[in-house]
Amino acid sequence: MNKTYKATGINLKAQAMGESDRIVTILTQEFGLIRAIAPGSRKYNSSLGGRSGMFVVNELLIAKGRSLDKITQAQTIKTYPGLAKDLGKLAASQYLAEIVLCQALSEQPQEELYELLNEHLHRLEELPKGESFGVLAYLAHAVFHLLALAGLTPQVQICCLTQRLLTPNFVDPNWRVGFSIAAGGIVCLEAWEGLRKEAQKESREKSLPHPVTPAYQTVVHRQEIPVISARLNSVELGMLQQLSQPEIMQINTTSDASWLSVEQILRQYAQYHLGRPIRSATLIDSYFAANHDATV
């Protein structure tokens, strides 16, 4: 880079610095994540005030610094005002920003991640007002796509144990499938139960006294039994399997609780692979708990 450089980026995080400045974390197409000072941006009528806000997309001219770069010019090309007008949309967008901050690299182009985030923020903003569980569905869709871009796609079409295709059984209301975070996706519960019983049987046999110890033993490595993180019904599995599509399935408001389950599964899966909690998820929990109470 020269002493100054140009970049197009979206603001994902801002924190106060000194009396009137901000440090802004920006996802840029050209250079990935950068942290730069927005000088005087907290002053009244500062030209950088609004341009350093969350989810504002700017064309930037940035001066290189010893420890932190400095924004010298910013021209706004896109904003998402609709996100701030709806608590659910705002919480969902902050949730996505946290994931992106964990995934994005510095000093490397991140055009695909930049475009994907902006696309899903646009979809969230365009949702009709009052569709609270639509927000949850669109959030789950975005999280799945971000995980896929990072190479962390959960296995939702075939069983992690048997490698056989699993399709939802909509006829049997008691039908369930397991989801194992450690195994990386869905698990046929019949196969899982068979492994568990086999392991219990072997454990009992080992505890019995053996009169003669053979000179040699055959070591058999059994398939590890994964922990089941959640159990999904047919509707929830169907939703999960459709999240890989470019467009989200038609939202059925009668399946509100199912979207809650799908989001919870993806949240736990993302946190496991990112190695940290998603703090904005607490806002999602509070928002949907309040909306559920209001409709009961």
Swiss-Prot record:
Q: Name one GO cellular component term.
A: bacterial nucleoid
The organism named in the record is Trichormus variabilis (strain ATCC 29413 / PCC 7937)
Q: Which family does it belong to?
A: Belongs to the RecO family.
| Domain of life per record | Bacteria
The protein's matches in NCBIfam families, at most eight in alphabetical order, are given as: reco (TIGR00613)
Q: Example GO biological process term?
A: DNA recombination
The entry's protein name is DNA repair protein RecO
The protein's job, in short, is: Involved in DNA repair and RecF pathway recombination.
Chain coiled-coil ranges: none
Record key words, sorted? DNA damage, DNA recombination, DNA repair
